[in-house]
Amino acid sequence: GPYATIFKDQTAGAYQSPLSCIEEMIESGMWNIANEVGDAKIKDPYTKYTSGDKEGGLYAVESWYSWHSRDDYTNNIFSIRNTYYGRIDDNDVSKVDGNLSAFNSYKDFDDEGDIAEHSLSKLIASTNPDLDEEIKTLIFASAKAIQAIPQPFRNNIDSEESVAAMNTCMELANLLLNEVKPYVNQTFGDPEYDDDLDAIAEQFVDAVVLPTYKDLQEKNKLLLDAVNQFRQNPSNDNFEKACNLWITAREPWEKSEA
């Protein structure tokens, strides 16, 4: 059956309980992309570049040809935020024009009501507010550190800001895998929490996953139409429209990662 039904109802495959869904959200979603951003998307180019393979480092940068790497990586981190908060939020790079340095912490950045009642954040905060605080702090710190890399990333691979962003993302990844997942298993593994976990899984699917992919589908339809229009009527204007829509379509794609 469809993913939404399988995940919410735990009817087949790896999802045999509400807890298995929460584990999937933490490890396969949140940890996986935090680790990928820190250990691959930033570290791979950095390692190649600083070892002397400058061309290899350049070509290892994701989206280097569009100068969109920083926003792609930041949207990856915002996908973790959406998963943890149980809600898609409009506090993204376009809203603040990439100026995350204007915010001292997530407390300045977040709006009231950003965190859904049925969310991982609310659940963890109910028993361990310090851990919830650490997670929220590192999510925002990772996004802020990425945006602090001088633009474009391809020209600043070996900058101290790149190293800081890489390390912060890896700190977030380590927290999610080595502290958050074990804590959730130990604290909420009893069947008495099944209803709470099930509500979080449903909120995640209905308010994060499905809207993200709906947005992705709609924006890719517009992109395809623009590409076909350029193919049929080549012009600078039609080429620019297709390029801009490609950039627009990347946002929900990168925000789908967690």
Enumerate the language-model features and the residues they cover.
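Mature extracytoplasmic or organellar-lumen-exposed domains after removal of signal/transit peptides
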Residues: 1-258
